[in-house]
C-alpha cells in the first residue's frame, strides 16, 4: 500500500495479505522490493493519490505495474478525488483511466462517468446511502454497495 498521509487503511498493517506500507518518502526501489515475490498477482493500493501527485518518483514504477498486470490478477487501485482526476492527463491516473474500469463513490452527476469514457444516465446524482458507488467497466456500469466492516 502507498499511503502518502494518515489513512484508515493503516489498520490493515500486520495483515498477512499486506506486503508493506510506503509513504511519501519511499522511492521506486522500495516499491520494487515489495513486488519482487509475485508481481503479476499483486495489487498496489494508492490512497489519496492527489496528495502523492504525478511527480513522485514512485509513479513510473506504478505505471509499469498497471501495464504488467493487464492479463493477470494483479493491478493498481488508485483512490483520488473525482475533481482531481479530470485534470490528470499524464501519469498513473491517466494510465489507470485508459483501462476504463473504476468505482465512483457517491457520484454527483452523469458527467462523473466521462473520466472513464462511460455514459451514465442523467438520473445519477441524487443522494445515495454511504458506500453506494457506480462500478464502471468496459461492458457498462452498475450500482454497487461497498461493504462496511463492523
Each language-model region and where it sits:
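P-loop NTPase catalytic phosphate-binding loop
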Residues: 1-97
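Phosphate-binding and hydrolysis-coupling loops of NTP-dependent motor/remodeling domains
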Residues: 12, 41-42, 79-80, 87-150
Amino acid at each position: 500500500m502507498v499511503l502518502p498521509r494518515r489513512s484508515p487503511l493503516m489498520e490493515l498493517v500486520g495483515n498477512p495479505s499486506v506486503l508493506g506500507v510506503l509513504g511519501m518518502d519511499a522511492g521506486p526501489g522500495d516499491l520494487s522490493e515489495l513486488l519482487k515475490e509475485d508481481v503479476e498477482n499483486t495489487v498496489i493500493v494508492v490512497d489519496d493519490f492527489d496528495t502523492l501527485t504525478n511527480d513522485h518518483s514512485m509513479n513510473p514504477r506504478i505505471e509499469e505495474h498497471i501495464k504488467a498486470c493487464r492479463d493477470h490478477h494483479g493491478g493498481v487501485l488508485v483512490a483520488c478525488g473525482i475533481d482531481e482526476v479530470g485534470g490528470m492527463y499524464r501519469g498513473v491516473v491517466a494510465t489507470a483511466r485508459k483501462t476504463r474500469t473504476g468505482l465512483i463513490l457517491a457520484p454527483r452527476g452523469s458527467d462523473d462517468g466521462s473520466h472513464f469514457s462511460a455514459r451514465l444516465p442523467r438520473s445519477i446524482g441524487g443522494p445515495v446511502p454511504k458506500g453506494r458507488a457506480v462500478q464502471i467497466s468496459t461492458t457498462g456500469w452498475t450500482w454497487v454497495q461497498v461493504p462496511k466492516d463492523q
